[in-house]
Structures are given as structure tokens and as C-alpha cells.
Amino acid sequence: MDQEIGFGDPLAWIRLDEALRREPYAPAGLAEPQLAVALCHRDGRIREAALQQAVGYRALLPLVVVWCADWVGQVRERARELLREAVDTDTAVALAPLVLLFGRRGRGAFAIELVGGVLRSASPEQFDPLFVHPDRAVRRFAHRLAVEEGLLSPGQLARAAARDADTVVQNLCAEAALAAVAKTGGHDEVLEPLLGARNPRARASGVTALRAAGQVERAEKFLGDRSGVVRACARYVVRQGGGDPLALYRAWCLAADPVPGAVSGLAECGERGDAALLWPLVSHASASVRARALGGLRLLDVVDVRRMLPLLDDPAPGVVREATLALLPSAGLVPDGPLMERLVGGWPKGWPRHVRVGAFRLLDARGGIVRLRAAVTVLDDPDERLRVWGAQVVQRWHPEEGMTPGDAEVGELLGRARHLFSDYVLTRRLWEAGLPGWPAGPSSSDSHPS
């Protein structure tokens, strides 16, 4: 009780309640700090008596909220009665984060309904702290009430959709803003914030609304947007206006410096024959263009192992990642020797991490002895995450059909990784590999897991 707790820290009030359940205070003429302790007492009779004295102590309202969900009926009803009497709009704004947090527990709906009902009469200015609260549940609650009560203009809703990081708030506000201007007009007030938003959901909503606003021509520049959902919406609007997105994509990809999003867009709506426009771009000076070209070739299912192999050593992580994804279905056609060389380079001077990760992913996809060999090799990698990944692969490894029984390399590799196994599991793995000198198999009475 030496530390002051404010309304803005809902978790602190719950922790206080949990910490003080066993304090032996009796509620008779208590001062405010002592009364707070009594309100958290384990005995329901003491909590009920403390509630009688809590009237007039605004600072203790968070604890009253807590006891609105008390398991003792008398305590619960008295707390709800006090909360009804004490809550006004300012108090409801202050208590909303705690109410929503505690409302996730059983019997928490009462406080949510009460605070929500009071907030419906609040002004937009009183909502401001809730609109920017760090807890997304609070922001969702506040924006939902504001939309239902019509507290925000279409422009304010559009700016909220563009600003908020939560997808639920983005969708809620964008849809409400567009629904409002569909009835009243004034699209410009809504379109500018949405089209300029950082988040793709808001931009996609704005692009889709261009058709209703009679501004179809503006959708063309969003055909090369960095987001796939925005590009899809832009293609729809352009087609509705009589345009041909595919022709535009083809023209842009023939340019000397195409927009990366246009490269992806060509693959999204193009044909396999359009791969001829993408292959030259895998050697483009821009890493983003190279990566998008590789992703487009994968999407069009036009993969050439020989032409893509050099890109596994690209200095840009995004390019190596796309090349790896494209080659994974054909991992069996990728020579494992050069890939292993990228895992065993001398440290600290060796291949970059993203190159080693790409090589390991392809070797892991090969399975069998190749997978085990690669996984044991990266146990000595300087990158901790890659070492952990390798250890997990080793521990899950089992001999596969088609492997040669009794392969001495398997025994040598498992021996290097013996610190990852118990003696029993190591013995079992070696037996599975058919190595000589090990038991013919665990007995049926063995209680160890396989």
C-alpha cells in the first residue's frame, strides 16, 4: 500500500486484489488505504462491510468494479449498486480499461454494459483518450460505440482507419466512413486519408471506393502497390472502368526501372507466357525487383533450377528467400555439395546468414542422410537460431525408406550430436539405422517411449 495506483493501470488493481486476499484486517472506521485492503479480504462478509464504507471514496472505484463480479451474491449486488450511483461520463472513461480487462472474467458483463451505456452520452472529446489507448480492446470498444452513436464524422472515421494499427478498428472505421459518404456524398473527405494510409486494409477500402466516387482513373497508380490486396482492388476498379490491368503490367515490366509491385501484379493476373518478361528482371539492379520477379515466376509455376541457383548467393536476403521458396519443390534437383559448402565456411568470415539459412532449408527438404548431415553441420553455426533449428531437426530425424542400412556416416553424425539425446534414444536411433553392434531392437517389456 506504499505505492499509489491510478485509474490508468487496470492490471495493478487486479494484482492488488490477489495480493491482499489473506490480510486479516477488520473493516471498522478504516482510512482509505486500510479500506482498500479490507475490500480485497478473502472473507466475503468483510468485503461487504468494507463496501458500505467505500461510498465517497472515488479512488476506490476500481476495486468496486472488481467486486461487481464477486462470487458472493451480497458483495456483488452491493458493488453494482455503488457503481451505478458513482459512474458518470468522466468516471466511465477512466474506468473503461479496467472494466474491459475484468470483463473477460465470469460475471464481468454488468460493468461493461453499465460503462458502455454511460459512454453513449459522452462527447467526442471525452472519447479521445480511449481512441488512442495502448490496449486494442479499449480502442475497439470506443470506436464501436462512436460509430453506433454517430459521434465521428466520415473524415474522422477515415483518419482513424488510417491511423490505428488494429485491423478490427481499421475495418470498422473504414466501412463506417464509406457507408456515410455513400448516403451524403463528399467522398474526397474520406478518400484522401484512406488512400494515403500506411496499412493496406485502409488503402484497399479507399481504392475500392474510387468507383463509387467516380474517380476510376485514380486506381491505376495503385496497380503497383506494395500490398497484394490493394493491387487486387485496383485491378477490379480499373476493369470496371474499361481498363486492362494486364496490358499495363506488361508495359511497366518492359520499362528500365519497373515498380516492384507491378512485377508481382503481372504474375497475379498474367499467364505462363508472361514469364518471358520476368526472367530478365531476376538480374535487375534493384533487390526488390529481383525478389518480386522470382516470386512471380514461382506463382506462374515457371521454375528453372539452373537459372535460379546463382540467386541463392544474392546479397539481398529477400532475393535468397524467394529463390529458396521457388526451388523447394525441386530440392532434389539442387546439388547438395555446393549447399553444404555454404554451411561449413570458416567463421567469422563465411557466407552471410541468409545464404546459410537458404542452403539449410533446401538440404532439409531433401530428407534422409542429407537432412541429417546438414542439421549436424549447423550445430556449430554462429547464429543461435540456426543452431536451435538444426538441433530440432536432428532430434526429429529418423532413417527413411531407401536409405542404406548400416551406413557408418549415420553413426558418425549421431555421435557428433549425442548431447541432444538420452542414451536410450540414441541407441534406438542407431538401431533404426541398422548399425552393427547395437541391440536388435527394444524388448516388448521396455517401458521407454520410442
Residue locations for each model-derived region?
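Core helices of alpha-solenoid repeat scaffolds
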Residues: 57-61, 123-124, 154-155, 187-188, ...
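Extended alpha-helical scaffolding segments
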Residues: 49, 60-62, 66-67, 73, ...
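Eukaryotic acidic, Ser/Thr-rich intrinsically disordered low-complexity regions
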Residues: 402-450
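Alpha-solenoid HEAT/Armadillo-like helical repeat scaffolds in large eukaryotic proteins
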Residues: 34-39, 63-71, 94-105, 126-134, ...
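Structural detector for internal amphipathic alpha-helices that build alpha-solenoid repeat scaffolds
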Residues: 10-27, 37, 47-56, 66, ...
